[in-house]
Amino acid sequence: MYIKTREIGTGCIGGKAAGMLLARNILRDEAPELYSSRIEPHDSYYIGADVFYTYAVQSGLWGSRIHMIEAEDYLKYAPDIRELLLNGTFAPSIKEQFMSMLEYFGQSPIIVRSSSILEDGFGNAFAGKYESVFCPNQGSLKERYDVFERAVKQVYASTVDPDALKDRAERNLL
């Protein structure tokens, strides 16, 4: 499965997502019997990193985020940025792609997972610092969309969690 056919927006995907795809390809090539008999078909979508950046700019928090990163007392800005991340607005084109994905999955449950370059890029592993959110994905398309959008925003907001910020600061990744 090609990433581009399952990517919402554009931009890089994180280390966990890339690693999962790489592992599947290695198994497919090196152990085809195991791959075909034991590995379930891959069925994920990826939200490109540019969606986060666009969301941050459109939601009016990019300047605040930059100010936080440059501040010595960066943790004091995190709660305000978290609120902005939870209450921002996605571009109409991204909303349409979210809707298409939800229509594709029907009412099957979805997990929104973080897979950022900062969180789990090569040499920067600190997996588990950002949230993963389970979406039951039940109800009308509008209800499912609202829950899914909230889940994505919650994962985005977890990027300014104090523990995540401290870990990133220790690695000079703010």
What annotation goes with each model-predicted range?
Residues M1-L174:
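Nucleotide/phosphate-binding sheet-loop regions of phosphoryl- and nucleotidyl-transfer enzymes
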